[in-house]
Every structure is written in structure tokens, then in C-alpha cells.
């Protein structure tokens, strides 16, 4: 049985996120990407004896796309990879706003059984000499908002990029298991409630 896993990327610094995606899919690094169109990448993989179909949605960087409403994505995305550039503080501020939006108290129209998996990634670790965002800041933001966190360099660290994706996919699989566990327990509780109500009626008759 195959599972579909959907990941949503940060809507800013699109060349950075596309670099991570291409690293994961092909193990190659390409520095420049067109950022005026959105992309959906698909990959089939086997993990923990499960056949998985992974879909990665990478949005365009047009200003109108950067309002991070995320309403539709909160419905279908199983996980979010929020990427910022450690040498650009404004990208970190935008990543923070996106995480706050994802972790807002859930409204009725986008209520989920479990929280979405979120991975905060500080990219361009190879540019530490011009760093504007400290490692501690990223770690603190992740801990406060129940996210995983790492710093890496898409340009230099193919293995680290792959491991980051594997970690969030594992988080998503754990969430799938939690959903499955909650469904039967809810059914059992309802069956017990119905049995109690009708059982009492039978006794009274």
C-alpha cells in the first residue's frame, strides 16, 4: 500500500528551496533557478518497509504569493519545510511568520487530527562568515513551535539534505500512525456510548 506525502516549502528564497529539492532528488547542486513559477516534484521511495509517493510543492516567489495565507495547504500538506538563509535576517523573519501561521490555534475549517510535521532549515551554512542569524535563534524558534531544526549547506552537503528529508518523512509516518490509532478508539467509545444508552432503555422496558 502506498502513502502520499505532501510537503510545502517556504514561499521566500525560492532558489534556496529548489536547490534543496534538486539535491534530494538528484544529488546535484544547481545555484540559480527561475523563481517565477511554482513546481510540484514527485519521488517514489521505500522507507521502513513502506512504499511511499512523495510530492513536494515548491511555490513561486511572486509578491502576491508571499502573503502566507496557507489555508489550502493546511488542508492537504502532511509536512512543511520552512527554509531561511542564515546570511539574510529578513528570510528568518519570514520563516518565523510562516511557522506562527502553521501553529496558530486551529480553526474549525482546517482542523486536523494531529499537528503537521514542520522542519525549520537554516541553509547556506557555508556562508558562516557573513552569518546574520545565529544557530541558537533557529533552535529556539523550532523548540518553541514543536519543529525539528537543522542547519546545512545545499551547495556542499548532499547527505545532510537527504537526512533532513528522511527525518521529516519519518515524522509524517508517525503522524499517520497516530491518526490510525485515534480512529478506532473513537469508534469504540461511540459504540460503548450507544450500547450504554440502548442497554439502559432495554432494562427499563
Swiss-Prot record:
Its EC number is 3.6.5.2. CDD domains: RERG_RasL11_like. This is Ras-related and estrogen-regulated growth inhibitor-like protein. It catalyses: GTP + H2O = GDP + phosphate + H(+). GO terms for molecular function: G protein activity; GTP binding. It comes from the Eukaryota. Keywords: GTP-binding, Hydrolase, Nucleotide-binding. Binds GDP/GTP and may possess intrinsic GTPase activity. InterPro entries: P-loop_NTPase, Ras-related_GTPase, Small_GTPase. Belongs to the small GTPase superfamily. Ras family. Residues 1-205 are annotated as: Small GTPase-like. GTP binds at residues 11-18, 58-64, 123-126. The keyword rRNA-binding does not apply. PROSITE patterns: RAS. Pfam families: Ras. PANTHER family: RAS-LIKE FAMILY MEMBER 11 (PTHR45704). It comes from Homo sapiens (Human). It is an enzyme of class 3 (hydrolase).
Amino acid at each position: 500500500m502506498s502513502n502520499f506525502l505532501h510537503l510545502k516549502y517556504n514561499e521566500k528564497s525560492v532558489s534556496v528551496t529548489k536547490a534543496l529539492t534538486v539535491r534530494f532528488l538528484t544529488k546535484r547542486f544547481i545555484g540559480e533557478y527561475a523563481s517565477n513559477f511554482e513546481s510540484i516534484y514527485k519521488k517514489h521511495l521505500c522507507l521502513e518497509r513502506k512504499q511511499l509517493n512523495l510530492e513536494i510543492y515548491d511555490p513561486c516567489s511572486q509578491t502576491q504569493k508571499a502573503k502566507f495565507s496557507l489555508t489550502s495547504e493546511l488542508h492537504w500538506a502532511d509536512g512543511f519545510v520552512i527554509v531561511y538563509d542564515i546570511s539574510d535576517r529578513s528570510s528568518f523573519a519570514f520563516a518565523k511568520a510562516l511557522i506562527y501561521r502553521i501553529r496558530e490555534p486551529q480553526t474549525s475549517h482546517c482542523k486536523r487530527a494531529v499537528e503537521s510535521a514542520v522542519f525549520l532549515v537554516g541553509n547556506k551554512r557555508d556562508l558562516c562568515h557573513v552569518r546574520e542569524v545565529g544557530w541558537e535563534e533557529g533552535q529556539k524558534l523550532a523548540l518553541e513551535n514543536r519543529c525539528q531544526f537543522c542547519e546545512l549547506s545545499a551547495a556542499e552537503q548532499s547527505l545532510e539534505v537527504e537526512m533532513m528529508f528522511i527525518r521529516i518523512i519519518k515524522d509524517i509516518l508517525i503522524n499517520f500512525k497516530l491518526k490510525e490509532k485515534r480512529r478506532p478508539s473513537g469508534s469504540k467509545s461511540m459504540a460503548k456510548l450507544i450500547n450504554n444508552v440502548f442497554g439502559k432503555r432495554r432494562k427499563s422496558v
